[in-house]
């Protein structure tokens, strides 16, 4: 295994990492900056994903020393489907898939198409940022509708999400960590309240199902 070093925050690498990836695409490397092995070959990655021995959680990794001020974030993250192994992951996945009935899936096509047309029709005449105006709006609105959350909440959902994923960025700072913790607490509190509302007044959405 070759030793490899490349700062993930180096501006030139951030803007265009592909020449570096091309050089290390064959075989495994030990990425010193991350202190872990890494692999970039499609064929090797494909083999790993098909290997039943590969899991999300590290085996016998011991207890992780989480700072007390970050504990609220990790208390929530610990229950994320992205962090779980079977059988908990399998159980949650079945629950989610059960909510996606053939009728609901069939209704999504025209619904998303109408949403896209609506957003496009509202494009301003002056120059604008298509990412914030369109590209981020489509998925967050669709997710809100699936959950049964009011569309007026989409900007709040997006802020919570953006703040929380900052925990996985290379340029993580104490300020970003504090924002992630605050947003995780706010999001969890909102969802707990909203789930209780849906329990008392079910609707045709993912939370009710």
Predicted regions and their residues:
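Conserved cytochrome P450 catalytic core segment spanning the I/J/K helices
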Residues: 133, 184-209
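Active-site substrate-recognition loop segments, prototypically the cytochrome P450 B′-helix/B-C loop
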Residues: 1-131, 140-158, 162-172, 177-182, ...
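Active-site/ligand-binding neighborhood in enzyme catalytic cores
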Residues: 136
């Amino acid at each position: 295994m070759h030793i490899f070093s490349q700062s993930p925050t180096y501006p030139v690498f951030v803007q265009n990492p592909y020449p570096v990836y091309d050089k290390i695409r064959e075989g495994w490397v030990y990425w010193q900056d991350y202190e872990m092995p890494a692999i970039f070959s499609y064929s090797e990655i494909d083999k790993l994903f098909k290997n039943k021995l590969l899991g999300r959680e590290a085996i016998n990794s011991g207890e992780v020393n989480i700072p007390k001020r970050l504990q609220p974030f990790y208390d929530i993250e610990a229950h994320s489907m992205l962090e779980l192994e079977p059988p908990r992951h399998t159980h949650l996945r079945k629950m989610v898939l059960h909510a996606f009935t053939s009728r609901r899936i069939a209704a999504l096509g025209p619904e998303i198409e109408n949403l896209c047309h609506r957003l496009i029709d509202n494009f301003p005449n002056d120059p604008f940022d298509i990412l914030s105006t369109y590209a981020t709006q489509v998925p967050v609105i669709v997710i809100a509708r699936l959950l049964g959350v009011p569309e007026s909440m989409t900007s709040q959902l997006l802020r919570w999400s953006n703040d929380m994923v900052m925990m996985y960025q290379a340029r993580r700072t104490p300020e970003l960590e504090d924002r992630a913790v605050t947003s995780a607490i706010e999001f969890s509190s909102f969802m707990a309240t909203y789930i209780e509302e849906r329990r008392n007044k079910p609707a045709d959405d993912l939370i009710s199902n």
